[in-house]
Amino acid sequence: GTASGKTLCYNLPVLEALNADPNATALYLYPTKALAQDQQRKIRDLWPDLCFGTYDGDTPPTDRRKLKDRGRLLLTNPDMLSGSVLPHHDSFNRFFSNLKYVVIDEVHAYKGAFGSHVSIVLARLKRVAEKYGAKPQFIMTSATIRNPKELAEGLIKEPVSVVDNDGAPKGQKTFVLWNPPFDESKGVRLSANAEANRLFVSLIKKRVRTIAFVRARVTAELLYRYAVDELASYGLADKVRPYRGGYLPEDRRQIEQALFSGELLGVTSTNALELGIDIGGLDACIIVGYPGSVSSVWQQAGRAGRGRDESLVFLIANADPIDQFIVQHPDYFFAQSPERAVIDPDNPYILLGQLRAMAYELPLKKDEVAQLSENAPAVTELLAEGGQLVPRGNRFFWMAKGYPANDINLRNISENTYSIVEKLKDGNQAIGSIDELSAFTQLHPEAVYLHNGDTYLVRELDLEGKIAYIERADTDYFTQAVTERRVLIQEQRLGRPFNTATFGFGDLDVTFITYMFRKIKFYTRDSFGFGSIGLPPSTLETCGLWLEISPKEVSLVLKYGRDPREGLLGIGNVLASLMPLYILSDPGDVGSAVDSSNTGKPALFLFDRYRGGIGITEKAYEIMEEMLPNALDVIKECSCERGCPSCVGARRSRQDLLDPDASPRGKLPDKAAALIILHSILNLDEYVPPEEESETPWEVKPLSESTEKRLRQMLSQIKEKGR
């Protein structure tokens, strides 16, 4: 659990072993550089004379040489281990020869694509250690998840013992589940962001040290911008900062230090501050929207009231189905986490890069490749056919040019990362980076990009050079891209009937077409204009499950004048939103689409949003019978009449999740059609939708052509003023 003394549990035995054996070494792995640097200060207090340190991209060359020559304890992250340490293992031969312990902190962070990569990085670590005669013991720590043993054993491919007694000191923590009221006149729930801003500003004005966690980078910037505007008149504008991924390392360190020292009163942050970086004692935590897992809620809540201090935590529900499920079922929160962490080291796209790196480090033996995963031998043969490897007897040798570890991005499966470059009068300056799918939706020409509370206009997206060029511009609006999805089944791997419906699972091609963007006003969130996007379609090769309904469901829906596709779209929105309740994943890891082009019948698709898949929808395929009744409950329990973002409508993908309040204002997926379909495939009584008020016809006398023209000009001027 959070603040349960896990760090001390591994520091004491490891440091004792290093003290007993003057040659012994140990490796500490943290999911982020910031965590490693934070822990360095604590170890220095325990053993000032120990030769140790962080080994990451920020480590100066002189310190790197010292750690290679004399270092007893290295604190690093999987990215650095994969990209710099293992490929140069010969210069670390003393360290690896004496390696006694490997500590992996925050194991629950190693899920999905990241965890799938790290499992193979750890296999690379073990084979390098074996070359130098070492067989280190692994110690792992985790927040509460449902399957810690399964995840840990999946990562290191060895049996583990679980220790789960929590003896942490705990101060009183007041936990508030906050559901913004439903606005019947607009048919939507009031803004979670606006509620969060009101709370955040109120707490800062009372000088209550507060962190506000949000689910998207842009939302962190928006909340900060709103807060600064209100706090300026109180002389507190410089007492708050935003914090998120994409900032330069020195900027993040400066914010962390300002929080720790008490210089700052508040911070708006993505989950980048969720893990155990020591930012001092905060008094309050605002969680804007369910972050995707119970463990994340408690990790974020644990940033306030460390030790025995009292603290206040608000979880403000968004309109998403999962948020509404949580606030309607509060007992779920205070029970043991039901989520499973999933990794898939058999992903062929992950294996392609990792096997190249393995062969560069040491020749690949056929038996170790076969033990790595089911697809590893086939991918190895492909590498040999492509001239990357040369087979000799039972081994494969690296023969290609280059440095293959540089081609691996552990945090994603896409090799396409775009740099964000600000155009300045005296040259250009890189201010961040982003993956390709996000670049197409956030950095298209004319998009507004937010960074550190400032607004920038995107002037160019260089697809060949993978660079987005931006310029500083003061705007009173931000942008949100609109995408269309098409799904093609490449190969069906699994299938089974379910009452009148059919489940399937297999390999999919999902094509994303980003064709337009909205302009949305700050504060009011009104959409006041559109623009076209001329970017090429992008295709995601992944895996996913599908639900195909029978002619019976189609007939029932049509009988009531509804569209089956709109019903399936609503069911997909609910299922994708509820996914993190069952499988430890991030909001947006799973996408949904409705397509009838594969079989001629309407089908709902749920797919992993990573190349090759990461196992989420494969696990979901096994538990669909458990998920569908809960999806029905979410829709039935919602107080809306026709459908809203709290049940069937407007769930946002990772790319669309720029501002949770800027949901589409147009027609929502059909609640009644979703209920008709679910009642039928769950063998319940036929659902009869309530009669709706019929539209009253009226006679519209056309205006004269000249009058209509003048009125249109006036409206255009009014709209322009509103910008």
Q: Where are these predicted regions, by residue range?
A:
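Conserved beta-strand residues within beta-sheet cores
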Residues: P159, A284, T455-L457, A603
